[in-house]
A protein has these predicted regions:
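Transmembrane helical elements of multi-pass membrane transporters/channels
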Residues: 13-32, 137, 148, 171, ...
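Helix-terminus/linker motif at the lipid-water interface of multi-pass membrane proteins
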Residues: 27-47, 116-125, 181-192, 253-286, ...
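Small-residue hotspots at the loop-to-helix junctions and early N-terminal turns
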Residues: 43-54, 131, 135, 271-286, ...
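Small-residue-rich hydrophobic transmembrane alpha-helices
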Residues: 46-106, 145-164, 276-340, 374-393
């Protein structure tokens, strides 16, 4: 185990604000679901919002993957204090994310019924109608989300993390306030129901973007960057991003596509299963938020060591991180099992006995898989990405998603007609063995790949 206090200080300095930010985002989703599920048509409303959010999750993962891919390069250049190249990389990523957001908004607006038809059974008329209303508003939140998260990703990679927590707290109260006003009709506004939840999300994202933008270009001093810097790029850095960073984005994108297709299968199995899956996924997010936040910190500390060409220290960090995350996985599995009943009781839709029974079984299954999730996240999201081994991570996600998870879920649902909790288990079956792949990969040295360039090599 590493005894250097700076290692732990740096990792937790990055992870704790990020974890709190994730927890705040989690609270936003939970409060949103609670308000929507308390409507008269609570089960249908929650099913509609959760299924549209599975489409949004595909977009979100795509953008966050593109941003996370930049951290592979930024963290290593940060280890060398090469600020000029960090600004160029950020400019490249921001424009890519903005372009992706516009593409998604265009598709959602032009083909809304076809898009919702992917994740909702055509026979679920009430769910579909509500989903179309929600999607027509919430899709516009994709644009401010892309810009603000590109900014936040850059700041986190250069160890500026506290401001993102403050902004997340403000976003939480903004979102909850807007939800209360527009869903139920308060302060003189009409009660919009499900579309009100979409409007609240859009307004909260705009507020978040304004605050992040002002802080990045007016307040923070770590990196001297101005809006005009967004117009400056370098072709060779774009090629490096395509080589080392883009595989992360594509990997997350294809994995999110797998998630969307899993939601499509669930969407064919009734509103009760859709609602139960929404509640269960929220509980699983509670169980993994600290894990993935700490993995982001691991990515930075490992990336800095590799960027500084201190490979012995990178290996030492790797070994310590793996032990830490295995222990964290055990703890989080216990926490989820302990809290599942009171958590389920927060949802109006869980008053339906079918929904409640499904939630209890599915959360128990998910809790066990959290142990494997925690370990492989430390490797694939933290160690491997920070060390430049992003292509291997993308390959593992690709093979596991398309050759294992989707076929298993499809067969369980439509061929073997398995009980719904077993179908849910199949959606997470990869979490039971990816940890072994990660463990084997880190036994050698192939995962260490310095992706920075010396000045003369860049020309």
């Amino acid at each position: 185990m590493v005894k250097d206090r700076e290692f732990y200080r740096t990792m937790f300095k990055i992870a704790l604000p990020s974890a709190l930010q994730s927890f705040i985002s989690f609270l936003v989703v939970v409060v949103d679901d609670m308000m929507v599920s308390s409507l008269k048509n609570g089960v249908a409303a929650q099913a509609a919002v959760s299924q549209v959010n599975s489409l949004t999750a595909f977009y979100t993962a795509t953008v966050l993957g593109l941003v996370s891919g930049s951290s592979v390069l930024i963290a290593q250049y940060w280890g060398r204090r090469d600020l000029g190249r960090i600004k160029r990389i950020f400019s490249i990523v921001l424009w890519i994310c903005l372009g992706v957001s516009l593409l998604f908004v265009g598709v959602m607006r032009l083909f809304p019924r076809a898009v919702t038809g992917i994740v909702i059974d055509k026979n679920e008329a009430e769910v579909t109608a509500l989903a179309l209303k929600y999607l027509s508003v919430v899709c516009f939140s994709y644009i401010p989300f892309a810009i603000s998260n590109a900014l936040v990703g850059m700041l986190r990679s250069i160890e500026v993390v506290r401001i993102t927590l403050y902004i997340a707290v403000l976003s939480l109260f903004t979102n909850i306030g807007f939800n209360y006003v527009f869903i139920f009709g308060r302060l003189g506004f009409p009660a919009l129901g499900v579309p009100g939840a979409g409007l609240a999300t859009l307004l909260a994202r705009i507020v978040e973007l304004v605050l992040v933008w002002l802080y990045t270009f007016r307040a923070q001093k770590r990196l001297d960057i101005r809006p005009r810097d967004l117009l400056k790029t370098e072709a060779w850095l774009a090629r490096d991003y395509a080589k080392y960073g883009l595989p992360v984005g594509l990997g997350d994108m294809q994995w999110a596509l797998v998630g969307m297709l899993k939601a499509a299968i669930i969407g064919q199995m009734g509103a009760a299963f859709m609602a139960a899956n929404s509640i269960t996924n929220s509980m699983m997010n509670l169980g993994t938020m600290f894990t993935f936040a700490l993995a982001g910190g691991a990515c930075v500390v490992v990336g800095k060591a590799v960027g500084a060409k201190d490979y012995a220290r990178a290996r030492q960090y790797s070994n310590t991180i793996q032990v830490m995350f295995f222990i964290i996985g055990l703890i989080m599995a216990g926490v989820v099992l302990l809290l599942r009943r009171p958590f389920i009781s927060l949802y109006g839709s869980a008053e339906d006995p079918t929904v409640r029974s499904l939630c209890l079984s599915m959360i128990a299954i998910g809790a066990v898989t959290l142990i494997g999730t925690s370990y492989h996240a430390s490797c694939f999201v933290g160690i491997n990405r920070g060390a430049g081994d992003s292509r291997f991570v993308a390959l593992v996600d690709l093979l596991c998603g398309w050759l294992v998870v989707l076929p298993a879920t499809f067969l369980a649902a439509f061929v073997f007609k398995a009980p719904l909790p077993i179908v849910f288990l199949c959606t997470r079956i990869d979490q039971c063995f990816k940890w072994l792949i990660a463990f084997i990969r880190l036994r050698g040295d192939k995962w260490i790949k310095n992706v920075t360039r010396d000045q003369e090599a860049a020309g």
